């Protein structure tokens, strides 16, 4: 039975299940989902919301699931709809009902929000490293290529500025108005490497401006990369013949 299906009289159609399921593309969030859950379980134990032994059992179970996923031994299913329910279902199957306590003081709303931000923090860092490596190489064709150095440097600045708004913790906001449990959001922020906590729960779980801003930064960067690649194509043409592109990076 689906998490939300308590009042329904019959199972949803397979076509609806397939349409609603996001596991095909949010499976990539498994590391962030497990990291967020480990931090949340640690906080629940620390605050005495669940027994420390229960928290330890949940954390051990999550770490084992992470290892199995990376070893290719876990198969996600559409029946569980998304990465969050897949992992929680596997955890409960392995360690019993204590696994259900992981969701204490947490909603899927703030859970997916923290996963999304953790993932984009990682991706922003990877893009920055790539752009840094690219700008480091643009030093031999003098003034012309230095124009690209300036473009890519501004791209890095945009990603760095975008990261300031990504790097804020939504976990602890619950569905939209927090929780009555005595959670420690500052502890969670420190555990997950966020620089600050989002103060408004409704904003934290419902808004995706940070994702749109991230895509905007990617679009501007791709515009600059497109311009650079177009020049390489032009320079390699018969009319110019400035450069020769290696066969390994060419097509017929």
Task: Please describe what each predicted stretch is.
Residues 116, 123, 140-252:
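Charged, flexible cofactor/metal-binding loops and thiol motifs
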């Amino acid at each position: 039975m689906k998490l939300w299906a308590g009042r329904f009289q019959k199972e949803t159609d397979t076509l609806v299940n397939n349409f609603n399921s996001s596991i095909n593309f949010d499976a990539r969030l498994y590391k962030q989902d497990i990291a967020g859950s480990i931090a949340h379980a640690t906080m629940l134990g620390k605050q005495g919301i669940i027994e420390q032994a229960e928290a330890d059992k949940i954390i051990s179970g999550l770490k084992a699931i992470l290892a199995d996923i990376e070893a290719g031994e876990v198969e996600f299913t559409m029946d569980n709809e998304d990465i969050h329910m897949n992992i929680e279902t596997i955890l409960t199957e392995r360690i019993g009902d204590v696994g259900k306590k992981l969701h204490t003081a947490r909603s899927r709303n703030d859970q997916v929000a923290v996963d999304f931000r953790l993932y984009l923090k990682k991706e922003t860092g990877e893009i920055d490293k790539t752009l840094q490596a690219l700008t480091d190489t643009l030093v031999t064709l003098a003034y012309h290529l230095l124009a690209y150095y300036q473009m890519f440097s501004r791209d890095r600045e945009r990603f760095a500025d975008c990261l300031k708004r990504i790097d804020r913790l939504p976990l602890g906001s619950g569905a939209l108005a927090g929780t009555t449990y005595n959670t420690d959001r500052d502890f969670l922020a420190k555990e997950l490497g966020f620089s600050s906590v989002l103060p408004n729960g409704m904003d934290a779980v419902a808004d995706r401006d940070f994702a749109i801003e991230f895509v905007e930064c990617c679009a501007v960067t791709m515009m600059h990369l497109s311009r650079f690649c177009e020049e390489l194509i032009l320079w390699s043409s018969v009319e110019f013949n400035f450069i020769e592109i290696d066969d390994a990076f060419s097509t017929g």
